[in-house]
UniProtKB/Swiss-Prot annotation:
UniProt keywords, alphabetically: Cell inner membrane, Cell membrane, Heme biosynthesis, Membrane, Transferase, Transmembrane, Transmembrane helix
Name of the coding gene: cyoE
The name this protein goes by in its record: Protoheme IX farnesyltransferase
Known pathway: Porphyrin-containing compound metabolism; heme O biosynthesis; heme O from protoheme: step 1/1
Function noted in UniProt: Converts heme B (protoheme IX) to heme O by substitution of the vinyl group on carbon 2 of heme B porphyrin ring with a hydroxyethyl farnesyl side group.
Length: 290
């Protein structure tokens, strides 16, 4: 039973988001003092709020999940976990997570994580995901909140650097999510979810992916120009963005779109991991600041 409750929180999604929290935290740490305890409380608070959102997503998406082969065996769908208990589980995690951020970090980070929660649960899960091709765009807002919370936990104020960080992760979410929608298109079709590749076609989705990767690259380089990043960041981001764009530029048609989209997806993970890692490396004494 414990394992089933853990599965409701979608640990993979939590881990991916915690990497982005680290990115925001490390970026802010270049200009503000930090402590290990603040990092731990921030990570734990964000993890609990994300876990709560994922549980609520499982509850409200149970009708959709039942139609897709990838999700039809989830605990809520099979009935192995009671919906009322799952909802209580989500509420407890939400309260503890936001409470930790409010008390141990600052109220601004708690407010921001709640804003992300509202976008994910109400605007994305309950509304746009089911009704609009722009659901991915709405979801990208909630996906870009964790790094911003990591940043605000340290600084307690918004800045141009914070805005660029938020924009960068919003832009990253789009091609990443469109790639997933392409290689899982049959599942989305069975569940009648209006993702871009289904509504507009795979070539239109490819065009959008290429544009978003290009704009992502510009914003990532803008963070070097206007933020507290060094030459290590510039080198890693330039290489990562070039590699990602090169993958998206490969020929793609009906015969290879699954393979192509999986390559775009995998490269997106490498790019964002490299981005987050280099921000941490630059905190080391031998890093070169600009």
């Amino acid at each position: 039973m414990f394992k089933e409750y853990v599965s409701l929180t979608k640990p993979g999604i939590i881990m991916g988001n915690l990497i982005s929290v680290l990115a925001g935290y490390f970026l802010a740490a270049k200009s503000e003092s930090i402590t290990l305890s603040l990092l731990v409380y921030t990570m734990l608070g964000v993890a609990l709020v994300i876990a709560s959102g994922c549980v609520v997503n499982n509850i409200f998406d149970r009708d959709i999940d039942a139609k897709m082969s990838r999700t039809r065996n989830r605990a809520i769908v099979t009935g192995s976990i009671n919906i009322e208990f799952a909802f209580l589980f989500a509420i407890i995690m939400l309260l503890i997570g936001t409470g930790l951020l409010y008390k141990m970090a600052n109220p601004l980070s708690a407010v921001m994580v709640l804003l992300g929660y509202v976008f994910y649960v109400f605007f994305y899960t309950m509304w746009y995901k089911r009704t609009s091709v722009y659901g991915t765009l709405v979801g990208s807002v909630s996906g870009a909140i964790p790094p911003l919370v990591g940043y605000l936990a340290v600084t307690n104020y918004l800045s141009l650097e914070a805005v660029l960080l938020f924009g960068l992760f919003c832009l990253w979410q789009m091609p990443h999510s469109y790639a997933i929608a392409m290689f899982r298109m049959k599942d989305y079709q069975q569940a009648n979810i209006p993702v871009l590749p289904l509504v507009k076609g795979i070539q239109k989705a490819r065009q959008h992916i290429m544009i978003y990767v290009l704009v992502f690259s510009v914003v990532a380089l803008g963070l070097y120009a206007f933020g507290h990043t060094g030459y290590e960041y510039l080198a890693v981001v330039a290489i990562s963005c070039y590699g990602w764009f090169k993958v998206t530029y490969r020929n793609m048609d009906e015969s290879n779109y699954v393979q192509w989209s999986k390559s775009v997806f995998k490269t997106s993970l490498l790019a964002i991991t490299a981005f987050s890692t280099v921000l941490g490396i630059e905190l080391l004494p031998f890093s070169i600041t600009f």
